[in-house]
Amino acid sequence: MKFTVIIPARYASSRLPGKPLLDINGYPMIQYVWQKAQQAGANRVIIATDHPQIQTVAKAFGAEVCMTSDQHQSGTERLAEVVAKMAIADQEIIVNVQGDEPLIPPIIVQQVATNLDKNGVNMATLAVKLTTREELFNPNVVKTVINDKGMALYFSRAAVPFARDHFSECDDTFVASQCYLRHIGIYAYRAGFIKQYVAWQPTVLEQLESLEQLRALWYGEQIHVELAKQAPALGVDTAQDLARVRQMLSQTV
């Protein structure tokens, strides 16, 4: 099975400007992400960016780069521009790896591509079991609810499903014993589906939750969710996250 990884790397960030270029123990964050994608066995890894400085840095460490607009509202829109510019065939499997995930395990990059390939859907993703109350009620931790076939029913920043009769006892033990899932922000799609996705109008749900995958559910598409073979650390959204990642990576050297 062949697949292409595209890494959206947007320069602007309200909390961490220039995030893809932030130094982690001597290397830019985007280089760690690119290396993980290479280790996953992708036949092609493309960094999609809107900023010439990211392009220069990425090319310096050997990455293939596609310059994109700075007007995109989501990573998927950036992917669509890459697919069009590079004339990627509609049946090609595209894996979207976020540019702020320097600790993403290569095994799950490969897993999400396989998930798409074997389940006959246009979009696939991964999740891990939630184990703490803190995660459940953290709006930065996206939750997903699935059916018995692993198809996503919904994604939310809220604590879903809501334990109506057990709220007062909703401690870590209770959370770990239930069907709560933390969504991992990695996706696989067919290139042709990415074109369809961006042709749809944005929806009220994706705008309320600020979750682009809800657009696919709104328009009736199925998203297959598989339990990840390895739980990744959270990505880098804040200065505190960056400090944590620096510490974790310094311990692996």
Swiss-Prot record:
Subcellular location: Cytoplasm
Protein keywords: Cytoplasm, Lipopolysaccharide biosynthesis, Nucleotidyltransferase, Transferase
Keyword Transferase: yes
Pfam families on file: CTP_transf_3
EC id: 2.7.7.38
Catalytic activity: 3-deoxy-alpha-D-manno-oct-2-ulosonate + CTP = CMP-3-deoxy-beta-D-manno-octulosonate + diphosphate
Associated pathway: Nucleotide-sugar biosynthesis; CMP-3-deoxy-D-manno-octulosonate biosynthesis; CMP-3-deoxy-D-manno-octulosonate from 3-deoxy-D-manno-octulosonate and CTP: step 1/1; Bacterial outer membrane biogenesis; lipopolysaccharide biosynthesis
GO cellular component: cytosol
Similarity comment: family membership: Belongs to the KdsB family.
Physiological role: Activates KDO (a required 8-carbon sugar) for incorporation into bacterial lipopolysaccharide in Gram-negative bacteria.
NCBIfam families: kdsB, PRK05450.1-3, PRK05450.1-5, PRK13368.1
Protein name: 3-deoxy-manno-octulosonate cytidylyltransferase
